[in-house]
Every structure is written in C-alpha cells, then in structure tokens.
Amino acid sequence: RTSMRNQLPCVVTAVTAVAHGPMVAVDLRTPCGQALASLVTRESADLLGLAPGLGVLALCKATAVAVGPTVEGTTAQAQPGTGCTLQGVVADVSPGLGAQEVALTLPSGHLWVGFAPQTEGLVVGRAASGRFAPSAVVMGLAS
C-alpha cells in the first residue's frame, strides 16, 4: 500500500546518465504505449537494477499532476528537461475550492488523477492531459 494514487505498470526503455551529475534519466513505456520519464539518483537506479526491458511500477502523487484540456494534434511526451504528459479521457471531476480533482482514464484503462483550476471547464468524456515533472515519478519493482 501507498498513498500515491497514480500507479502504472511500465517497462524501462532506456537509462541514461545525466552529464556532470548524480542523476539518471529513465525512459518508460506505459501499457498503452505512452512515454514517461523519471529522474532518479544513480544509486537508486543501481539498487533497482534499472535496465531496458525491466518491468517497473511508476507512481506519482496526484498533487503533482496538472490536468488540462488536450490540445488538438498534440501527442503524449516524456522529456526529462520539460516534463511528462499522459493523455486520456476525463472519467470523474470532483469540485473543490479553487481547484478540482480530475481522474483521467488512460487508453490502457488505468486511472491517472490530478488537479485543474475550476476555469479549465473539464467535463466527463472530454479529452484531457495530465502534466507532471519527471522528478515526481517514483519507481518500484513490479511483482
């Protein structure tokens, strides 16, 4: 168990040392083929034995995910310097003060939860994207 509601099985596609630093960029592929990225320390990468082909569980706090409408013609992306974007369809919207919690159904059927300003106009059934920093993606070994 964990308090992180966003949990997605992924496969490592690349592990790249970040120049002049203790960080490692890890490229991941989701079950629906979308790309994710994670930044971890070299020590963490070694402890997990991260290598292409390894199955991992990618986790991310809902509070780290900014949800907004999907812009026509954009695709899912994952770049360590600029961030990650997962695309899905709004499954649920829970209003709150100033922000609303939004659950996205990804093409794989998994849910990805984040927050959006009330002004985004997100409604159930509408295409939307969740954006978050690679540093917010935690990995665990899949069992």
Regions flagged by a language model, labelled:
Residues 26-36, 104-112:
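Short solvent-exposed strand/turn elements
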